[in-house]
């Protein structure tokens, strides 16, 4: 920037405030936000409910087992019973059920045989995803128990 000399002083003052000082009203807002955990408590309850919708739904599908995570918004179901790589099964779900998952192999050799699903979504979308996966598995793997 090459402003007129009269503007340089004003720009320097603005830059100092932007780069090195948090305004008092912002400090007051941050202090207030830290006083209450109500929004955090609600968020934990929401994610717990969503996790349970997804994981309980997945565990009801023959051939899929899934543990409940305690500290993330991801589910990592075991799909080894289908005899497919995680990449193959993820592609099947995308193509045939319209459900996006991440192959466990993307996280290293120990992730093979698993998929990653995120439950940072609405209850309705999670229920729909479980329904689509269950419908696909029932059609494609009718002998799965």
How would you describe each model-predicted region?
Residues 1-145:
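PLP-dependent class I/II
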């Amino acid at each position: 920037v090459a402003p007129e000399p009269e503007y340089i002083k004003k720009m320097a003052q603005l830059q100092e405030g932007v780069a090195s000082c948090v305004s008092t009203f912002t400090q007051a807002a941050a202090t207030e936000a830290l006083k209450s955990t109500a929004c955090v408590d609600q968020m934990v309850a929401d994610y717990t409910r969503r996790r349970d919708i997804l994981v309980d739904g997945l565990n009801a599908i023959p051939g899929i087992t899934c543990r409940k995570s305690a500290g993330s918004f991801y589910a990592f179901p075991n799909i080894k019973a289908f005899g497919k790589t995680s990449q193959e099964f993820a592609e099947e779900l995308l193509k045939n059920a319209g459900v996006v998952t991440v192959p466990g192999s993307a996280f290293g050799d120990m992730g093979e045989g698993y998929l990653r699903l995120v439950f940072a979504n609405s209850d309705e979308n999670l229920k729909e995803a479980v329904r689509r996966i269950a419908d696909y598995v029932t059609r494609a793997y009718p002998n799965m128990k």
